[in-house]
């Protein structure tokens, strides 16, 4: 998905290299036509979000890419890969913005699940940056964080309300990694499997 999003950024003025990348994506899709998302029956209706960011990944404007995904039970139900609207000055800021995007989706899904009489609180949001996690717990502005736009601090508000609970996860187990950058083949296949994208026929 990340490669599709990168190619989409150049729709207005594509180059030969973009066509080569799109052909490679189409070749991958043709080779994995028998793959799909696996939704096993009988899983508990628990929700968990994963957020990650590729700090300054865009070579043109140095904006970071946010990647998020959400599992209901053990099944992938929501994902997104998007370039951030502003330039982050640190990895912490980029990860904090990505976690905010993840939190917004968690809140929407929480409301949808309440329509089915499923009530969830303290929904875990997994992040692999301890500084970003600490920023959600500390309301005091420091010189290194005071420039962060107010709209990104709604994450802290919802953590304090108990809607979601941001937790540390080791980078090796960070499922959202696949939505932020190109990965080595073995790592890509590992995350694809962990997300429940399997050969189904």
Protein language model features and the residues they cover:
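Active-site-proximal structural scaffolding
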Residues: 18, 28-30, 63, 102-105, ...
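RNase H-like nuclease module associated with reverse transcription
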Residues: 46, 76, 82-201
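C-terminal reverse transcriptase regions that engage the nucleic-acid substrate
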Residues: 1-36, 170, 178-180
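Secondary-structure capping and boundary motifs in well-ordered enzyme cores
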Residues: 14-18, 42-43, 62-63, 90-95
